[in-house]
Amino acid sequence: MEPILLTDREEYQFVTDRGFCPLLDYKRFTMDIRLRVEIQRELFGHCVFGRGNIPQANVRFFRWIWEHKPHQCEETLRPLSSYSAVYCSHILTRGSHPEMAHDPRNINILCFEMHNRWENGDREKMRIYPGNVRIIELLKNEYGSLRI
């Protein structure tokens, strides 16, 4: 089934009012990248391109992620009992891709050990690697179109 394209605020509001989360659910919904960035700025702060209060935006973003994703490590499937920003692991790092830092699709929920493995280890051997490669391609294509 093809994902549903959301092009304006009314469509976004329509699906969120019905319990869907199009910022995360990229398999069901595709959002116009400009709409996505606009909504992310409103939810988390005006720091998508390096402006604004980045630490406060990070706190809002990580809390939002924790509220909207299952509380288990995506690699080991172990439950994670309480909130910690350490569990929010960027697929593409904030330093190399600051424009994607507050895109919920760019986050895996990982326990501390798996977060370190993704950042510093042999990520190619991780269970989440193939899915993350697809997400990386999707993110780079969408955000690349913003620069045109």
Where are the predicted features?
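Polybasic, low-complexity binding patches
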Residues: 95-109, 113-148
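Short, charged surface segments at domain edges that flank catalytic/cofactor-binding sites
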Residues: 2-12, 18, 25-72, 99-101
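Short cysteine clusters
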Residues: 21, 73-76, 111-114
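Intrinsic disorder/low-complexity signature
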Residues: 5, 29, 55, 87, ...
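Histidine-centered nuclease catalytic patch
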Residues: 74-109
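Broad structural signal for hydrophobic residues in well-ordered alpha-helices, predominantly aliphatic
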Residues: 64-65, 76, 125, 139
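Ordered hydrophobic segments in well-structured contexts
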Residues: 12-13, 108
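Intrinsic-disorder/low-complexity peptide segments enriched for small residues
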Residues: 3-4, 21, 137, 144
